[in-house]
UniProtKB/Swiss-Prot annotation:
Enzyme Commission number: 5.1.1.1
A Pfam family reported for this protein in Swiss-Prot or TrEMBL: Ala_racemase_C
KW Transferase (keyword) present: no
GO MF term list: alanine racemase activity; pyridoxal phosphate binding
Protein name per the record: Alanine racemase
Organism: Shewanella frigidimarina (strain NCIMB 400)
InterPro entries registered for this protein in UniProt: Ala_racemase, Ala_racemase/Decarboxylase_C, Ala_racemase_C, Ala_racemase_N, Ala_racemase_pyridoxalP-BS, PLP-binding_barrel
Enzyme class: isomerase
Pathway(s) where this gene product acts: Amino-acid biosynthesis; D-alanine biosynthesis; D-alanine from L-alanine: step 1/1
Length: 372
C-alpha cells in the first residue's frame, strides 16, 4: 500500500497545461512561476516536467518547455541550479542583501529591483560582471515597485550603474486581473505603456489571470503561476474551463468505518449530531497535514465515485465523513480530498479560502509523488 496522505502530481497535466498556456499566449515567452515549492507540487518536480532540466532536454523541447522560472527566494533559485536547471531564473521579490549579488552573478540569476535600497546596494558594489535587472513599476498594486513619479529617475540611475546589464527589463503586477470586469487592470496596462513606451528591454505584465483574461497584457513574457497547476485564479471559475488539468490530487485512505446512531455526536466539541442512523468514515488526514481545520461541515470529499460530506471538526490527524446508512465503503479505500474528481477551487469555496492557499500549505507529512 502506498503511503498516505499523499499529493499525487501528474507529469502529463503539468506538460499539458504548459502547452495550453502556449496556445493562449502564442506570442509570449513563458516564465513558469514555481515559488512556494512549486505551489506545493515540488519545485524540482515542476522543473523536470515543464522544462529546462538538462537531463530531460529532449522531452522539454518536444513539449515546448518553459522559457524561464519565476521564484520568490534566492534559495529556491539555487535549488534549481543545483538540480540542473540552466535557463533563465528571475527573483520576483529581488535580492534582500548586498551579499546576495555575487551569488546572482555567479549563478546567472536575474533580479527584480523594486526599492531604493536595492538600487543603492547595486551602486555601491563591484561585481565580476553586471547583473540582469527587471525594474518593477507600481501601476496600481501598491505593494512593491517604483511609483510612476519615481520611475524615470530610477531608470536613469540603473542605466548609469555599471553593475546593471543592459537593456533593463520592465515589469508590473496586476492587482485585480482575477476580476475580469474590474477596470483597474486596463488602467494599469495604460499606465505601464505610458511609462515604458520607446524603452528597450523585455516587458512582462501578465500573471495567470492576466494571461487567461486580459490577452492584450501578454507582452514579451507571461508569468503563469496557479494556472500552470491546472487551477483558475478566478473565484467561481475552474481550470477545466480553460482546458487546464488539475496537476495535484490530494489523497488519503479510510482508516475506520463505524456504525453511528441517530442522536450521537462526533469529534471535538461534539459540534455535529447525526439526525438518523448512518455510517461514518474516518480519513487519515488533518490540519497537521495542511488540510484546513476550519473546513465546515458539508465540505465534500470523494470516495468510491461519489461525494460525501465532512462532519464534525477536522482534527490534527483525522477527519470524519458521513458515508450514508447503506454505504459499502471499507477500511483502506482511497479518499480524494481534491483533484480531478473534486476541483480544488470548489473545496476552497466551501472553506472560504482560495485554491492557492490549499495547495501551498500542505505540510511535510504529506508525501509528494510525481506520476507519469
Amino acid at each position: 500500500m502506498k503511503p498516505f496522505p499523499r499529493a499525487e502530481i501528474s507529469r502529463y497535466a503539468l506538460q499539458s497545461n504548459l502547452a495550453q498556456l502556449r496556445l493562449i499566449a502564442p506570442n509570449s515567452k513563458i516564465m513558469a512561476v514555481v515559488k512556494a515549492n512549486g505551489y506545493g507540487h515540488g519545485l524540482l518536480n515542476v522543473a523536470e516536467c515543464v522544462g529546462l532540466l538538462n537531463y530531460v532536454e529532449s522531452v522539454c523541447k518536444y513539449h515546448g518547455g518553459a522559457d524561464g522560472f519565476g521564484l520568490a527566494r534566492l534559495e529556491e533559485a539555487l535549488q534549481l541550479r543545483e538540480g540542473g536547471v540552466k535557463g533563465k531564473l528571475l527573483l520576483l521579490e529581488g535580492f534582500f542583501r548586498q551579499s546576495d549579488l555575487p551569488t546572482l552573478v555567479s549563478h546567472n540569476i536575474d533580479t527584480v529591483v523594486h526599492h531604493e535600497s536595492q538600487l543603492q546596494m547595486l551602486e555601491t558594489i563591484a561585481l565580476d560582471k553586471p547583473v540582469t535587472v527587471w525594474i518593477k513599476i507600481d501601476t496600481g498594486m501598491h505593494r512593491i515597485g517604483f511609483s510612476l513619479e519615481q520611475f524615470n529617475s530610477i531608470y536613469q540611475r540603473l542605466l548609469a550603474c555599471p553593475q546593471v546589464a543592459k537593456p533593463i527589463h520592465l515589469m508590473t503586477h496586476f492587482a485585480c486581473a482575477d476580476e475580469p470586469d474590474n477596470p483597474l487592470t486596463q488602467t494599469q496596462m495604460n499606465a505601464f505603456e505610458q511609462q515604458v513606451s520607446g524603452l528597450e528591454g523585455d516587458r512582462t505584465l501578465a500573471n495567470s489571470a492576466g494571461t487567461l483574461f486580459w490577452p492584450t497584457s501578454q507582452a514579451d513574457w507571461v508569468r503563469p503561476g496557479i494556472a500552470l497547476y491546472g487551477v483558475s485564479p478566478v473565484v467561481g471559475d475552474r481550470g477545466v474551463n480553460h482546458r487546464l488539468i488539475p496537476a495535484m490530487e490530494l489523497v488519503s485512505n479510510l482508516i475506520a468505518v463505524r456504525e453511528h446512531k441517530a442522536g450521537d455526536s462526533v469529534g471535538y466539541g461534539a459540534s455535529w449530531t447525526a439526525k438518523k442512523d448512518t455510517r461514518l468514515g474516518v480519513v487519515a488526514i488533518g490540519y497537521g497535514d495542511g488540510y484546513p481545520r476550519n473546513a465546515p461541515e458539508g465540505t465534500p470529499v470523494w470516495i468510491n465515485g461519489r461525494r460525501v460530506p465532512i462532519v464534525g471538526r477536522v482534527s490534527m490527524d483525522m477527519l470524519t465523513v458521513d458515508l450514508g446508512a447503506d454505504a459499502q465503503d471499507n477500511v483502506g479505500d482511497s479518499v480524494q480530498l481534491w483533484g480531478k474528481a473534486l476541483a480544488v477551487e470548489e473545496v476552497a469555496e466551501h472553506i472560504g479560502t482560495i485554491a492557492y492557499e490549499l495547495v501551498t500549505k500542505l505540510t511535510p507529512r504529506v508525501v509528494v509523488e510525481l506520476l507519469d
